[in-house]
Amino acid sequence: MAIRKSQVYLSLANSYLIDSPQPSTLNYWYNLGSLLGLCLVIQIASGIFLAMHYSSHIDLAFASVEHIMRDVNYGYLIRYIHANGASFFFVCMYAHIGKAIYYGSYKSPRVLVWVIGVVIFIITMATAFLGYCWVYGQMSHWGATVITNLFSAIPFIGKDLVPFIWGSFSVSNPTIQRFFALHYLCPFILAALVIMHLMALHVHGSSNPLGISSNIDRLPFHGYFVFKDLVTVFVFLLIFSLFVFFSPNTLGHPDNYIPGNPLVTPASIVPEWYLLPFYAILRSIPDKLGGVIAMFAAILILLVLPVTDRSVVRGNTFKIISKTFFFLFLYNFILLGQLGQLHVEVPFIQLGQFATLNYFLYFIFIVPVVSTLENILFYIGRVHNN
């Protein structure tokens, strides 16, 4: 017997990375998981090196970032890799979630995989927010102030909870230090969740674009899918390198190169681009508590998809109506991202409310109604063919 099968730890790696049977019909959209793993490794590695030279004291935070940029050997490169790596992490994550919704990867028996994936998404957003704050530029300070103030909308405990989060009466030294500590911890929690995600996926294996059982037509992960993954890894690294070396600040905000000043409010307070759709949902509700509930509900509503999707056929590959509404949903989500960076004024307020309503209607109304309709059409077609 080969050593990769007889040795305890190697046999575990073998069952996941070498002999793992995968559907032969997997397309390149299924490579996003490996790209997300690569992004996580890049973020952890670059983050550890940045933490070696960063000071979390509020009076030194901004200066220490500039010290990394100017004085540390290749410090500018490490920082740009980390900053752009966060953006590319979310590009791959949003694409991965979109792929899962399109191909019905959340349906039984992979509900646990989907639930863990949503938890990973939430922790990743929290990690990104915490990391954006401890740069302590102007946008970092006011972003931390605005987002943490949202907790004051919680009835009864909100007013006391915000100073507890700050560790003071405003965003100050304890806030930045605890945000840095949590930001350093979160990627390792993510790594543990990713392992759980893979373990849950390994039970039933990957789904496939056709939405049918592929048990009779599978291929070993190595070397078919390893080399297939390498194709997208090289493409990813090429595009990533173009941003890091030639346009490192495109995905950032210029106000964050100004030291944080609690006495000067920026013209517009916006988070990083990958949080904009949910920020737009938050702003579209006039009531503060309602906006906070809507923002968190917009993320947690992903968990209802295994329940609301009643289709007997997995995925949208052969379903024209579902496919049409999915692309309308995709356009609506991009629209929310655009609205999140615009000023709160007419007509963007009404457009944001309309897009928010469409976002929730997709999960609550469109998916169950359309899937039920397509089930009826499916059974009519099967009876007619028989």
From Swiss-Prot:
Binds 2 heme b groups non-covalently. Heme b b562 binds at residues 82, 183. InterPro entries: Cyt_b/b6_C, Cyt_b/b6_C_sf, Cyt_b/b6_N, Cytb/b6-like_sf, Cytochrome_b, Cytochrome_b_C_euk/bac, Cytochrome_b_N_euk/bac, Di-haem_cyt_TM. The keyword Transmembrane applies. GO terms for molecular function: metal ion binding; ubiquinol-cytochrome-c reductase activity. Its main location: mitochondrion. Coiled coil: none annotated. It is found in: Mitochondrion inner membrane. It is a multi-pass membrane protein. It comes from the Eukaryota. Its cofactor is heme b. CDD domains: cytochrome_b_C (cd00290), Cytochrome_b_N (cd00284). A ubiquinone binds at residue 202. Keywords: Electron transport, Heme, Iron, Membrane, Metal-binding, Mitochondrion, Mitochondrion inner membrane, Respiratory chain, Transmembrane, Transmembrane helix, Transport, Ubiquinone. Heme b b566 binds at residues 96, 197. Pfam families: Cytochrom_B_C, Cytochrome_B. One of its GO terms (biological process) is mitochondrial electron transport, ubiquinol to cytochrome c. One of its GO terms (cellular component) is mitochondrial inner membrane. The chain crosses the membrane at residues 32-52, 76-98, 113-133, 179-199, 225-245, 289-309, 321-341, 348-368. Heme 1 (or BL or b562) is low-potential and absorbs at about 562 nm, and heme 2 (or BH or b566) is high-potential and absorbs at about 566 nm. Fungal cytochrome b-c1 complex contains 10 subunits; 3 respiratory subunits, 2 core proteins and 5 low-molecular weight proteins. Cytochrome b-c1 complex is a homodimer. Belongs to the cytochrome b family. Component of the ubiquinol-cytochrome c reductase complex (complex III or cytochrome b-c1 complex) that is part of the mitochondrial respiratory chain. The b-c1 complex mediates electron transfer from ubiquinol to cytochrome c. Contributes to the generation of a proton gradient across the mitochondrial membrane that is then used for ATP synthesis. This is Cytochrome b. It comes from Wickerhamomyces canadensis. The lineage of its organism: Eukaryota, Fungi, Dikarya, Ascomycota, Saccharomycotina.
